[in-house]
């Protein structure tokens, strides 16, 4: 066979793979690539008779191309996380969910887990919720969870489907946790009667729910909580009033910035800086009418305690207790990063304006008066933190009552020689052991309240012990580190770490004693 015949055969074979219609005039030019000359990058040598009318050289053409303004092809830089339209990925929306394809069942399960994870609850509760929904739908699932994402593998009748869900940010929303608990109870009772679209409509209602409180209400809640926190740390009326102003302004700014969709650390640093400055301005104002008010500078620490990440700190410990190491370590890292950033900003502002974390002056109250005030301030503090976590008023009040009992007990055990003098004790209980007992009591009381009030246990336990997180110790450790006082830094840091470690241990023991689902590994 000669060369001409071989070329003819090759052309016939290529024509068989031509996917374009020869009669389509719009696509004619696409079938054959244009020659390199058409891109005008290769310069032909000009004729001698053209002289100065010859085209510019190749180098000048390249220079002109490089000097042009950048071309835009309709691609815009958007958010790092795209929103999923769950209704668009459903293939059998009007079919009963139990009879739907595996992909539709996976969308229901993953959307349920996404809403739970976005609410700030721990990995065990997210997995448990997804497992219970999967059980209703007749699917076996395996879930690997982290702070902002999870991977879910669904198995049914020899088929396997894998799905990954990612969140743009994290936060705490106890009202949404409560709504998801109600959704779960509804599903376990009537779930086999719902279609795929009905599942997604219920989940859409939960997802589209607005926060219960405006930024100014969040600021007021932080003001009340931090003012009460300052009293529990040993502060007096002047420190409480200034912390009220500082925390209110700081958390209002922080909530407003977060509402605009900006980053958490931008909101955090702005809120802490404004809280410290507002505390000083309030102190200067009081100094005009109250002699000696400027000597009460140490309360500025209380004005910034609204940023202490109590929820991720506690849930990190609970995740680690259930061997959800990936989620636990990520939550712990997130909490530590917030603490470090907040304390560094607080230290920087304190250095600029001349504030220092000194000890509070004794209040001189009797044991009975101090105990009663601790009960009231513990309730106010826990109630305020619960509102910051978006708890409804009744839920926040229930958490406040639990915190009033457990936190007052903790403080009384630490100050036992002065609070209970008739026992004749020489020393009080170590703060670490008292924190364990306080968390244990909170967990046991929350178990009783969960039965009576149907509130999620975590929405009662965590706010009730957030007030036990040693924010003062954490700040002082970072303050002394920045001033290169290593001895004091290590002392306050070790104290803070031990107390923080014992808080989730106490909750875990209470959960083990009262919840069989938590008690077992499977």
Q: Which residue ranges define each predicted feature?
A:
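Hydrophobic alpha-helical hairpins/lids featuring a short glycine-rich hinge
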Residues: 166-243
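Short juxtamembrane and helix-loop transition motifs at transmembrane-helix boundaries
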Residues: 197-210, 223-235, 254-262, 353-367, ...
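Core alpha-helical transmembrane segments of integral membrane proteins
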Residues: 211-316, 386-389, 393
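Hydrophobic alpha-helical segments embedded in the membrane of multi-pass proteins
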Residues: 220-224, 244-252, 272-273, 375-381, ...
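Alpha-helical membrane-inserting segments
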Residues: 228-233, 249-257, 273, 277-286, ...
